[in-house]
């Protein structure tokens, strides 16, 4: 190998190193962007999880309140209507107070089964 070929080889290797260094810089920049995006997404994910937990807790509390309200709503009036129906009277808005002669009334039953 003569001096010219050695010099060309060194120049070629130097160009390759420069190209690889440029690629390494681009990869480093891209990696930094990915790390920043990952951190941002983790923060957002944590925020959304806390928000979801809060909403779930609210729904559970509302469900408990509604259950208590339903238990309070079904009280003496409902019992009186059920007793009247068992005694053979209509409790529906169509035939309220009249005597049931043909067995069960679907309107009355649907009214009693409302929750």
Swiss-Prot record:
Q: What cofactor does its activity depend on?
A: Zn(2+)
Q: Record-annotated residues binding Zn(2+)? A: 90, 92, 105, 108
User: Where found?
Assistant: Cytoplasm, Nucleoid
Superkingdom of origin: Bacteria
CC cofactor note: Binds 1 zinc ion per subunit.
Task: Please provide, in alphabetical order, the Gene Ontology terms of the cellular component aspect for this entry.
Answer: nucleoid
Q: Which UniProt keywords apply?
A: Cytoplasm, DNA replication, DNA replication inhibitor, Metal-binding, Zinc
First-listed, main subcellular location of the protein, grouped into a coarse class: cytoplasm
What does this protein do, in the record's words? Involved in control of chromosome replication initiation. Inhibits the cooperative binding of DnaA to the oriC region, thus negatively regulating initiation of chromosome replication. Inhibits the ability of DnaA-ATP to form a helix on DNA; does not disassemble preformed DnaA-DNA helices. Decreases the residence time of DnaA on the chromosome at its binding sites (oriC, replication forks and promoter-binding sites). Tethers DnaA to the replication machinery via the DNA polymerase beta sliding clamp subunit (dnaN).
**Which HAMAP family does its entry note?**
YabA
Supply the name of the protein: Replication initiation control protein YabA
Write the gene name.
yabA
């Amino acid at each position: 190998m003569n001096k010219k070929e050695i010099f060309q080889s060194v120049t070629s290797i130097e160009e390759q190193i420069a190209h690889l260094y440029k690629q390494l810089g681009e990869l480093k920049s891209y990696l930094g962007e990915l790390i920043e995006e990952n951190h941002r997404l983790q923060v957002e994910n944590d925020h959304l999880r806390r928000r979801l937990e809060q909403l779930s807790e609210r729904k559970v509390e509302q469900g408990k309140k509604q259950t208590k309200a339903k238990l309070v709503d079904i009280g003496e009036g409902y019992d009186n209507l059920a007793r009247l129906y068992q005694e053979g009277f209509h409790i529906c808005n169509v035939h309220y107070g009249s005597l049931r002669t043909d067995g069960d009334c679907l309107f009355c039953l649907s009214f009693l089964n409302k929750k």
